[in-house]
Protein backbone atom coordinates (compact mmCIF):
# COMPACT_ATOMS: atom_id res chain seq x y z
CA UNK A 1 0.00 0.00 0.00
CA UNK A 2 1.18 3.53 -0.75
CA UNK A 3 0.32 4.74 2.76
CA UNK A 4 1.27 2.85 5.93
CA UNK A 5 -1.22 2.57 8.78
CA UNK A 6 -1.60 5.20 11.52
CA UNK A 7 -0.31 8.20 9.59
CA UNK A 8 -1.31 11.84 9.42
CA UNK A 9 -1.31 13.76 6.15
CA UNK A 10 -1.30 17.48 5.36
CA UNK A 11 -4.05 18.30 2.87
CA UNK A 12 -3.48 20.21 -0.38
CA UNK A 13 -4.67 23.72 0.55
CA UNK A 14 -4.82 26.31 -2.21
CA UNK A 15 -3.12 29.51 -1.11
CA UNK A 16 -1.53 27.85 1.89
CA UNK A 17 0.54 24.67 1.43
CA UNK A 18 3.42 26.21 -0.45
CA UNK A 19 6.98 25.17 0.36
CA UNK A 20 7.42 27.36 3.49
CA UNK A 21 4.07 26.17 4.85
CA UNK A 22 5.02 22.53 4.37
CA UNK A 23 8.42 23.08 5.98
CA UNK A 24 6.61 24.49 9.02
CA UNK A 25 4.42 21.39 9.06
CA UNK A 26 7.49 19.13 8.91
CA UNK A 27 8.95 20.92 11.92
CA UNK A 28 5.61 20.30 13.63
CA UNK A 29 5.80 16.57 13.04
CA UNK A 30 4.21 16.07 9.60
CA UNK A 31 5.72 13.42 7.33
CA UNK A 32 3.19 13.20 4.48
CA UNK A 33 2.26 16.43 2.70
CA UNK A 34 0.73 17.75 -0.50
CA UNK A 35 1.59 20.86 -2.46
CA UNK A 36 -1.14 23.37 -3.13
CA UNK A 37 -3.91 22.19 -5.42
CA UNK A 38 -2.89 22.80 -9.05
CA UNK A 39 -5.41 23.95 -11.64
CA UNK A 40 -5.32 21.96 -14.89
CA UNK A 41 -6.05 25.02 -17.02
CA UNK A 42 -3.26 27.05 -15.43
CA UNK A 43 -0.77 24.28 -16.10
CA UNK A 44 -2.04 23.63 -19.61
CA UNK A 45 -1.73 27.29 -20.56
CA UNK A 46 1.52 27.75 -18.59
CA UNK A 47 0.00 30.50 -16.44
CA UNK A 48 -0.36 30.93 -12.68
CA UNK A 49 3.18 30.35 -11.43
CA UNK A 50 3.13 26.56 -11.52
CA UNK A 51 6.85 26.24 -10.87
CA UNK A 52 6.63 27.77 -7.39
CA UNK A 53 3.54 25.72 -6.59
CA UNK A 54 5.39 22.53 -7.47
CA UNK A 55 8.75 23.25 -5.82
CA UNK A 56 10.21 20.47 -3.65
CA UNK A 57 12.53 20.78 -0.66
CA UNK A 58 15.56 18.57 -0.04
CA UNK A 59 13.55 16.79 2.66
CA UNK A 60 10.76 16.08 0.17
CA UNK A 61 13.16 14.76 -2.44
CA UNK A 62 14.32 12.15 0.06
CA UNK A 63 10.94 11.42 1.61
CA UNK A 64 7.33 11.90 0.49
CA UNK A 65 5.60 14.66 -1.45
CA UNK A 66 2.44 14.59 -3.55
CA UNK A 67 0.43 17.05 -5.57
CA UNK A 68 -3.22 17.38 -6.52
CA UNK A 69 -4.86 18.28 -9.82
CA UNK A 70 -8.23 20.02 -10.17
CA UNK A 71 -10.18 20.49 -13.37
CA UNK A 72 -13.17 19.32 -15.40
CA UNK A 73 -11.97 19.61 -19.00
CA UNK A 74 -10.57 16.32 -20.28
CA UNK A 75 -8.25 17.91 -22.83
CA UNK A 76 -6.82 20.36 -20.28
CA UNK A 77 -6.29 17.52 -17.80
CA UNK A 78 -4.34 15.62 -20.45
CA UNK A 79 -2.15 18.65 -21.20
CA UNK A 80 -1.66 19.35 -17.50
CA UNK A 81 -0.48 15.77 -16.97
CA UNK A 82 2.13 16.26 -19.68
CA UNK A 83 3.49 19.21 -17.69
CA UNK A 84 3.32 17.40 -14.34
CA UNK A 85 5.26 14.47 -15.76
CA UNK A 86 8.31 16.74 -15.87
CA UNK A 87 8.33 16.79 -12.05
CA UNK A 88 8.92 14.11 -9.42
CA UNK A 89 6.08 13.26 -7.06
CA UNK A 90 5.16 10.16 -5.12
CA UNK A 91 1.56 10.34 -6.31
CA UNK A 92 -0.96 12.54 -8.12
CA UNK A 93 -4.33 13.10 -6.47
CA UNK A 94 -7.48 14.20 -8.29
CA UNK A 95 -9.71 16.76 -6.60
CA UNK A 96 -13.40 15.92 -6.38
CA UNK A 97 -14.01 17.72 -3.11
CA UNK A 98 -13.13 21.42 -3.23
CA UNK A 99 -16.32 23.42 -2.38
CA UNK A 100 -14.88 26.89 -3.05
CA UNK A 101 -17.23 28.84 -5.37
CA UNK A 102 -14.58 29.80 -7.95
CA UNK A 103 -13.82 26.08 -8.42
CA UNK A 104 -17.40 24.84 -8.24
CA UNK A 105 -18.70 27.35 -10.81
CA UNK A 106 -16.28 25.83 -13.35
CA UNK A 107 -17.82 22.40 -12.76
CA UNK A 108 -14.69 21.17 -10.99
CA UNK A 109 -13.93 20.00 -7.45
CA UNK A 110 -17.00 19.03 -5.44
CA UNK A 111 -19.30 20.00 -8.33
CA UNK A 112 -17.57 17.50 -10.61
CA UNK A 113 -18.10 14.79 -8.00
CA UNK A 114 -21.85 15.26 -8.46
CA UNK A 115 -21.51 14.36 -12.15
CA UNK A 116 -20.22 10.85 -11.60
CA UNK A 117 -19.95 9.85 -15.26
CA UNK A 118 -17.89 12.89 -16.22
CA UNK A 119 -15.88 12.74 -13.00
CA UNK A 120 -14.79 9.22 -13.88
CA UNK A 121 -13.96 10.28 -17.43
CA UNK A 122 -11.70 13.02 -16.05
CA UNK A 123 -10.05 10.69 -13.55
CA UNK A 124 -9.48 8.06 -16.25
CA UNK A 125 -7.76 10.71 -18.38
CA UNK A 126 -5.47 11.57 -15.50
CA UNK A 127 -4.57 7.93 -14.85
CA UNK A 128 -3.89 7.39 -18.54
CA UNK A 129 -1.60 10.36 -19.09
CA UNK A 130 0.19 10.87 -15.76
CA UNK A 131 3.15 8.73 -14.72
CA UNK A 132 2.39 8.91 -11.00
CA UNK A 133 0.39 6.69 -8.68
CA UNK A 134 -3.23 7.95 -9.00
CA UNK A 135 -5.45 8.71 -6.00
CA UNK A 136 -8.56 10.81 -5.43
CA UNK A 137 -10.02 13.08 -2.77
CA UNK A 138 -13.78 13.58 -2.58
CA UNK A 139 -16.67 14.75 -0.45
CA UNK A 140 -19.69 12.66 0.40
CA UNK A 141 -22.42 13.31 -2.17
CA UNK A 142 -25.45 12.89 0.10
CA UNK A 143 -25.50 13.24 3.86
CA UNK A 144 -28.09 10.53 4.59
CA UNK A 145 -27.67 8.16 1.64
CA UNK A 146 -24.24 6.56 1.12
CA UNK A 147 -25.16 5.00 -2.24
CA UNK A 148 -24.09 7.88 -4.54
CA UNK A 149 -20.74 8.26 -2.79
CA UNK A 150 -20.14 4.52 -2.91
CA UNK A 151 -20.93 4.55 -6.64
CA UNK A 152 -18.34 7.26 -7.24
CA UNK A 153 -15.75 5.47 -5.10
CA UNK A 154 -16.38 2.17 -6.87
CA UNK A 155 -15.78 3.78 -10.24
CA UNK A 156 -12.57 5.42 -9.05
CA UNK A 157 -11.22 2.17 -7.63
CA UNK A 158 -12.09 0.28 -10.81
CA UNK A 159 -10.15 2.89 -12.80
CA UNK A 160 -7.07 2.38 -10.65
CA UNK A 161 -7.29 4.74 -7.68
CA UNK A 162 -4.70 3.49 -5.17
CA UNK A 163 -6.18 5.46 -2.24
CA UNK A 164 -9.26 7.54 -1.47
CA UNK A 165 -9.46 10.50 0.88
CA UNK A 166 -13.03 11.16 2.00
CA UNK A 167 -14.25 14.43 3.51
CA UNK A 168 -17.32 13.58 5.57
CA UNK A 169 -19.34 16.67 4.64
CA UNK A 170 -21.25 17.54 1.48
CA UNK A 171 -20.45 20.40 -0.87
CA UNK A 172 -23.25 22.45 0.71
CA UNK A 173 -21.79 22.01 4.19
CA UNK A 174 -18.57 23.64 3.02
CA UNK A 175 -16.33 23.48 6.15
CA UNK A 176 -19.06 23.57 8.79
CA UNK A 177 -21.54 21.07 10.15
CA UNK A 178 -21.14 17.59 11.56
CA UNK A 179 -18.88 15.13 9.76
CA UNK A 180 -20.69 11.94 8.74
CA UNK A 181 -18.40 9.29 10.21
CA UNK A 182 -20.72 6.44 9.19
CA UNK A 183 -20.33 7.00 5.44
CA UNK A 184 -16.55 7.22 5.74
CA UNK A 185 -16.60 3.94 7.68
CA UNK A 186 -18.79 2.30 5.03
CA UNK A 187 -16.37 3.35 2.29
CA UNK A 188 -13.43 1.96 4.26
CA UNK A 189 -15.23 -1.35 4.80
CA UNK A 190 -16.35 -1.57 1.16
CA UNK A 191 -12.85 -1.05 -0.25
CA UNK A 192 -10.44 -2.79 2.16
CA UNK A 193 -7.92 -3.31 -0.63
CA UNK A 194 -6.86 0.36 -0.66
CA UNK A 195 -6.11 2.98 2.00
CA UNK A 196 -9.08 5.17 2.87
CA UNK A 197 -8.06 8.43 4.54
CA UNK A 198 -10.59 10.21 6.75
CA UNK A 199 -10.85 13.99 6.49
CA UNK A 200 -12.91 16.82 7.92
CA UNK A 201 -13.24 18.68 11.19
CA UNK A 202 -10.01 17.59 12.89
CA UNK A 203 -8.79 20.54 14.97
CA UNK A 204 -7.45 18.78 18.06
CA UNK A 205 -6.02 15.57 19.48
CA UNK A 206 -9.51 14.64 20.67
CA UNK A 207 -11.00 15.28 17.21
CA UNK A 208 -8.46 12.93 15.65
CA UNK A 209 -9.15 10.23 18.23
CA UNK A 210 -12.88 10.53 17.53
CA UNK A 211 -12.31 10.39 13.77
CA UNK A 212 -10.25 7.22 14.03
CA UNK A 213 -12.64 5.55 16.44
CA UNK A 214 -15.84 6.38 14.56
CA UNK A 215 -14.60 5.74 11.00
CA UNK A 216 -12.20 2.88 11.61
CA UNK A 217 -9.62 4.76 9.53
CA UNK A 218 -6.12 4.87 10.99
CA UNK A 219 -5.06 7.37 8.33
CA UNK A 220 -6.29 10.93 8.85
CA UNK A 221 -5.77 14.05 6.75
CA UNK A 222 -5.45 17.42 8.51
CA UNK A 223 -6.51 20.58 6.73
CA UNK A 224 -7.90 23.69 8.42
CA UNK A 225 -7.01 22.28 11.83
CA UNK A 226 -3.32 22.57 10.95
CA UNK A 227 -3.57 26.20 9.83
CA UNK A 228 -1.47 28.15 12.29
CA UNK A 229 -1.06 24.97 14.30
CA UNK A 230 1.62 22.84 12.60
CA UNK A 231 2.37 21.22 15.97
CA UNK A 232 -0.97 19.41 15.79
CA UNK A 233 0.82 16.55 14.03
CA UNK A 234 3.20 15.93 16.91
CA UNK A 235 0.52 16.57 19.55
CA UNK A 236 -1.69 13.85 18.05
CA UNK A 237 1.28 11.51 18.25
CA UNK A 238 1.82 12.33 21.93
CA UNK A 239 4.09 15.36 21.74
CA UNK A 240 3.87 18.59 23.68
CA UNK A 241 2.32 21.89 22.54
CA UNK A 242 4.83 24.61 21.62
CA UNK A 243 6.34 27.00 24.12
CA UNK A 244 5.91 30.71 23.45
CA UNK A 245 9.50 30.96 22.20
CA UNK A 246 9.03 27.95 19.92
CA UNK A 247 5.84 29.53 18.60
CA UNK A 248 7.64 32.80 17.87
CA UNK A 249 10.49 31.00 16.13
CA UNK A 250 8.08 28.97 13.99
CA UNK A 251 6.16 32.03 12.81
CA UNK A 252 9.36 33.96 12.09
CA UNK A 253 10.96 31.09 10.18
CA UNK A 254 7.78 30.39 8.21
CA UNK A 255 7.37 33.98 7.04
CA UNK A 256 11.11 34.36 6.38
CA UNK A 257 10.83 31.40 4.01
CA UNK A 258 7.99 33.14 2.21
CA UNK A 259 10.06 36.31 1.81
CA UNK A 260 12.88 34.29 0.24
CA UNK A 261 10.45 32.61 -2.14
CA UNK A 262 8.24 35.52 -3.20
CA UNK A 263 10.11 38.69 -2.25
CA UNK A 264 9.13 40.84 0.72
CA UNK A 265 6.22 42.81 -0.77
CA UNK A 266 4.35 39.80 -2.14
CA UNK A 267 5.27 37.58 0.79
CA UNK A 268 3.98 39.97 3.43
CA UNK A 269 0.64 40.32 1.67
CA UNK A 270 0.33 36.53 1.68
CA UNK A 271 1.63 36.35 5.24
CA UNK A 272 -1.22 38.36 6.75
CA UNK A 273 -3.68 35.45 6.72
CA UNK A 274 -0.94 33.04 7.81
CA UNK A 275 -0.03 35.16 10.84
CA UNK A 276 -3.72 35.53 11.67
CA UNK A 277 -3.96 31.74 11.84
CA UNK A 278 -0.92 31.52 14.10
CA UNK A 279 -2.45 34.11 16.46
CA UNK A 280 -5.88 32.47 16.61
CA UNK A 281 -6.92 30.71 19.80
CA UNK A 282 -3.78 31.51 21.80
CA UNK A 283 -5.11 34.27 24.03
CA UNK A 284 -3.35 37.14 22.29
CA UNK A 285 -5.01 40.57 22.42
CA UNK A 286 -7.06 41.61 19.39
CA UNK A 287 -4.64 44.47 18.71
CA UNK A 288 -2.09 41.94 17.46
CA UNK A 289 -4.56 40.56 14.92
CA UNK A 290 -5.25 44.10 13.74
CA UNK A 291 -1.52 44.62 13.23
CA UNK A 292 -1.25 41.32 11.36
CA UNK A 293 -3.86 42.55 8.88
CA UNK A 294 -1.59 45.37 7.67
CA UNK A 295 1.86 43.76 7.73
CA UNK A 296 4.11 45.12 4.99
CA UNK A 297 7.65 44.50 6.25
CA UNK A 298 9.43 41.61 7.92
CA UNK A 299 10.64 44.05 10.58
CA UNK A 300 7.00 44.76 11.47
CA UNK A 301 6.47 41.05 12.01
CA UNK A 302 9.51 40.93 14.30
CA UNK A 303 7.99 43.71 16.42
CA UNK A 304 4.62 41.96 16.49
CA UNK A 305 6.21 38.71 17.68
CA UNK A 306 8.16 40.58 20.34
CA UNK A 307 4.87 42.02 21.64
CA UNK A 308 3.05 38.67 21.43
CA UNK A 309 2.23 37.81 25.03
CA UNK A 310 -1.04 35.96 25.77
CA UNK A 311 -3.58 38.17 27.53
CA UNK A 312 -3.82 35.73 30.45
CA UNK A 313 -0.08 36.06 31.05
CA UNK A 314 -0.27 39.84 30.92
CA UNK A 315 -3.12 39.82 33.44
CA UNK A 316 -1.16 37.55 35.76
CA UNK A 317 1.89 39.81 35.57
CA UNK A 318 -0.20 42.86 36.39
CA UNK A 319 -1.69 41.17 39.45
CA UNK A 320 1.70 40.09 40.72
CA UNK A 321 3.22 43.51 40.23
CA UNK A 322 0.23 45.19 41.80
CA UNK A 323 0.51 43.02 44.90
CA UNK A 324 4.20 43.86 45.15
CA UNK A 325 3.25 47.51 45.42
CA UNK A 326 4.80 48.65 42.13
CA UNK A 327 1.72 48.89 39.93
CA UNK A 328 2.62 52.45 39.08
CA UNK A 329 5.48 51.15 36.95
CA UNK A 330 3.04 49.52 34.52
CA UNK A 331 2.39 51.34 31.25
Regions found by a protein language model. Give the residues of each.
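Glycine-rich, positively charged N-terminal anion/phosphate-binding segment
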Residues: 2-4, 13-83
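Glycine-rich phosphate-binding active-site loops on the catalytic face of alpha/beta enzymes
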Residues: 36-40, 95-102, 168-172, 201, ...
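Alpha/beta catalytic cores of nucleotide-metabolism and tRNA/nucleoside-modifying enzymes
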Residues: 1-9, 14, 19-20, 121, ...
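Short secondary-structure transition/capping segments
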Residues: 44-49, 104-107, 147-148, 176-178, ...
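Alpha/beta enzyme core
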Residues: 24, 78-92, 96-108, 117-194
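Short beta->alpha connector loops at strand-helix junctions that form conserved
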Residues: 36, 114-115
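Hydrophobic faces of well-ordered beta-strands that scaffold small-molecule active sites
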Residues: 8-11, 33-35, 65-69, 92, ...
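Short glycine-enriched, charge-decorated loop/helix-capping segments at active-site entrances
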Residues: 107-113, 237-240
